[in-house]
Curated annotation (Swiss-Prot):
Its job: As part of a cytosolic protein quality control complex, the BAG6/BAT3 complex, maintains misfolded and hydrophobic patches-containing proteins in a soluble state and participates in their proper delivery to the endoplasmic reticulum or alternatively can promote their sorting to the proteasome where they undergo degradation. The BAG6/BAT3 complex is involved in the post-translational delivery of tail-anchored/type II transmembrane proteins to the endoplasmic reticulum membrane.
Region (Disordered): 306-325
A matching Pfam family: GET4
Name of the protein this chain belongs to: Golgi to ER traffic protein 4 homolog
Gene encoding the protein: GET4
SUBUNIT field: Component of the BAG6/BAT3 complex, at least composed of BAG6, UBL4A and GET4/TRC35. Interacts with BAG6; the interaction is direct and localizes BAG6 to the cytosol. Interacts with GET3.
GO cellular component, one term: BAT3 complex
Length: 325
């Protein structure tokens, strides 16, 4: 017992010394940055990163790179900050660190500070999503998608925000963003189409709960939609009935519904493609023998279905939803 206690105390002392050492190093690096010696400080950060990694001090390396990136961002040094941000990801990958909310929030913070138009940001988010999936082949952790969506929403990048909301579990946030997107960029005649596309895509992703939440929230909060159901817009009534039919799972109801609302469904050629997939997922409709999907259509559907073939360095960039206007 005494030996174990002594070992624990020694470990605590070593940990305290390590933290103290990191803090001293950070102080020196911060002083270099404050003096404007950006290049020298950047190279020092990189040297220390690889030294820590070689010693398997992954947490220290990650924390130092994260604080360094934030420091460079605060001084407008985008390239140096982005480089250290990528090293944060490298430490996570090599240490095989488990996904945790705190880490996802740190990554989202770094993303939010990057130049929205920089290629480094695209590379960072693609790699961050891949790490956050934990090797599951999915398109990234839902919480990280949510955090990215919120940042992009603040930047009024509605299209990319929408993509990330679709891969999160935040139906309410998605609906609120779509209300703003519709009122800011859409035509009044398209208010129903914004939410219809989102609901159909959520269903294609087998996320029935978020599909229902996004529809209810959007129709309640959009200033151009009068109380319902039933609604003035036939397409909204179709979506309302579809969500009820999905709960029931009766193929005859689904088939009649799609036939009756064909005039509304013809407003966007993608609707029937989505409904083919929804029929397979929720109503036991057999898949088509040969796929008619190609080009942009096929890429979009593959992304929405969570195809592992789309899971690569550029999947986030290539899988953005189509514009409505």
């Amino acid at each position: 017992m005494a030996a174990a206690a002594m070992a624990e105390q020694e470990s605590a002392r070593n940990g305290a010394r390590n933290r103290g050492g990191v803090q001293r190093v950070e102080g020196k690096l911060r002083a270099s940055v404050e003096k404007g010696d950006y290049y020298e400080a950047h190279q020092m950060y990189r040297t220390l990163f690889f030294r820590y990694m070689a010693q398997s001090k992954h947490a220290e390396a990650r924390e130092l790179m994260c604080s360094g990136a934030l420091l460079f961002f605060s001084h407008g040094q985008q390239n140096s900050a982005a480089d250290l941000s990528m090293l944060v990801l490298e430490s996570l990958e090599k240490a095989e660190v488990e996904v945790a909310d705190e880490l996802l929030e740190s990554l989202a913070k770094l993303f939010s500070l990057m130049d929205p138009n920089s290629p480094e940001r695209v590379a960072f988010v693609s790699r961050a999503l891949k790490w956050s999936s934990g090797g599951s082949g999915k398109l990234g952790h839902p919480r990280l998608h949510q955090l990215l969506a919120l940042t992009l929403w603040k930047e009024q990048n509605y299209c990319e925000s929408r993509y990330h909301f679709l891969h999160s579990s935040d139906g309410e946030g998605c609906a609120n963003m779509l209300v703003e997107y519709s009122t800011a960029r859409g035509f009044r005649s398209e208010v129903d189409m914004f939410v219809a596309q989102a609901v159909l895509q959520f269903l294609c992703l087998k996320n029935k709960s978020s599909a229902s939440v996004v529809f209810t929230t959007y129709t309640q909060k959009h200033p151009s939609i009068e109380g319902g159901p039933p609604f003035v817009q036939p397409l909204l009534n179709f979506i309302w009935f579809l969500l009820l039919a999905v709960d029931g799972g009766k193929l005859t109801v689904f088939t009649v519904l799609c036939e009756q609302y064909q005039p509304s469904l013809r407003r966007d050629p993608m609707y029937n493609e989505y409904l083919d997939r929804i029929g397979q997922l929720f109503f036991g409709v057999p898949p088509k023998q040969t796929s008619s999907y190609g080009g942009l259509l096929g890429n979009l559907l593959s992304s929405l279905m969570g195809s592992s073939e789309q899971e690569g360095e550029d999947s986030q960039d290539d899988s953005s939803p189509i514009e409505l206007d």
